[in-house]
Amino acid sequence: MRIVIITGLSGSGKSTAVRALEDEGFFCLDNLPVSLVTTFIELVEHSREDIKDVALVMDIRSRDFIKGYDQVFQAMASAGHSVKIFYFDATDEVLIRRFSETRRRHPALEGASVPEGIRFERDQLAGLRRIATAIIDTSEMNVHRLKELVIGLVKGGEGVLEMQVNLQSFGFRYGLPLESDLVMDVRFLPNPYFVATLRPFSGLDQGVREYVMGHKETVVFLEHFRNMLELLLPSYRREGKSYLSVSIGCTGGRHRSVAIAEELYNYFRQRNVNIKITHRDIDKGLG
């Protein structure tokens, strides 16, 4: 029997995932106590119904879940069942907004605020997150994308949405991009701003790019940073992340960060990475 465990944070999209699996013919059950899981699986096995695919929503609402899930999962695997654990996640900001929109209280901690409930739930589920088959970050997903991703995962990877990388340059003077997953500070690189003939131009112009790339420290840095991203991107994909925001910052967001972002964009685009580029602050400070 194929068993999919749907778990993770409250408000992260588990109900949507269950509906997607129901549409694929899975027998779905929500909030089954851990103590009854083994009995339930045995009943399904001996049922007259031809049930081959089961999805169980198991999370912190069942108070014995945290202490008992490991033993139950091992028992299912030992019985010869194919067990996959899909852990659904989202950023605190997104979860807080979703709870605010639905006017729901957080179910994990009675009497606590939503942020307190989220922190408590993250802490309680940390061990489960580490053993998950896939970690699905729904922060940037709509319902359609989430359903498509879940269906792709149960089909062994077919149809899984390709992760989109959003590369952007910015100026620290104007604040960090709040949506950033990764931030790289390139203010240590030689600054074209202090070259009078280059100051009016941007990192999109050849002269500025040649100046930035013409220094050994830039070449060495770029090689190491590219290698790091090439290591990280597959790991983020395996976690089920559909969107990765990489921000490159310099002082004003016009010269160094733009030049470096363009170099990275061209490099990864040639390697068929689904990547987009924006320059948030390139036109600021001109007047």
Swiss-Prot record:
Alphabetic keyword roster: ATP-binding, GTP-binding, Nucleotide-binding
Q: Where does GTP bind?
A: D59, I60, R61, S62
Q: Which InterPro entries match?
A: P-loop_NTPase, RapZ-like, RapZ-like_N, RapZ_C
> GO molecular function terms here?
ATP binding; GTP binding
Name of one Pfam family that matches:
RapZ-like_N
Which positions in this protein are listed as binding ATP?
A: G8, L9, S10, G11, S12, G13, K14, S15
HAMAP family recorded: RapZ_like (MF_00636)
Q: What does this protein do?
A: Displays ATPase and GTPase activities.
The entry sums up its family as follows:
Belongs to the RapZ-like family.
Please give the name of this protein.
Nucleotide-binding protein GM21_3387
